[in-house]
Amino acid sequence: MKQKLFLFLLLLYTTTKLNATNSLLSKSPFSASLELSTKYIWRGIEYGTAPTVFPMIGYGYKGFNAFAMGGYAIDGSHQEVDLGVSYSSSEFTIGVSDYYYPSAVGEKDGYFKLNNRNTGHWVEAYATWTGTKIPLWITLSSYIFGADKNEEGKQMYSSYAEVGYTYSFNDDNNIALCVGANLNKGFYTGYQSGFNVVNINAKYSTAFKFGNYKLPVSASYVLNPYKNKSFFTMSLYFGI
């Protein structure tokens, strides 16, 4: 009980400090954030077996954005290092992201081993349309380089499409619903099947208020019809 109380007070203190810092740095093009999640689920796929920490730093200027992010399960079952750049204009965003998984590629792999035949990197290109008059988004993405290969070593260009809608009750309460599908015989279906719905997600986001400070939180229910799996996760967010 004392440990739970200590953890709560620590989170409250951290949130207070980060919000205070945020007010001072609101005009900076740089940002930093930390997400704590009970489980890492992305596009209907489970990564790791334990709560996961996601530190991230970013830079944004006149539509250009760059980021570096990590993902670390507390039991060591998953590690991830991501880099990305994107450009947004009006309702459209295009970008490229690099995903690297030290826990999955083995000791023989190296971060700077960039030969496409045996690299551990997964490089993805994507485009997103986000409506300004209606709260709808559409994303198309495809792995274009790296470890996205079948057993024969063939580059599979695994592609994914997602359509989502956000309904806002007020500034601090909204629910987002989305459906995502694998478009070809690729990674999302273990290279075994073509078009399939792999991600149905309902996410509720709100913020706990402590005086003038807010702690953003979210809860998500995720269903992967192809794998016949469902998940429920919760996350806390801290940012400067």
Question: What does each model-identified segment do?
Answer:
Residues 28, 49-53, 60, 77-81, ...:
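Residues that define the transmembrane beta-barrel architecture of outer-membrane proteins
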Residues 113-186:
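Detector for outer-membrane/organellar transmembrane beta-barrel domains
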Residues 20-73:
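Short glycine/proline- and aromatic-enriched beta-strand/turn motifs that initiate or cap beta-hairpins
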Residues 21-29, 95, 130-135, 168-176, ...:
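Short loop/turn motifs that connect adjacent beta-strands in outer-membrane beta-barrel proteins
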Residues 202-208, 228-240:
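Outer-membrane beta-barrel "beta-signal"
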Residues 44-48, 78-82, 105-113, 148-155, ...:
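Outer-membrane beta-barrel translocator domains and adjoining extracellular loop/strand segments
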Residues 1-29:
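Cleavable N-terminal export/targeting peptides
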Residues 34-40, 63-74, 94-102, 109-111, ...:
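Transmembrane beta-strand segments that form the barrel wall of outer-membrane beta-barrel proteins
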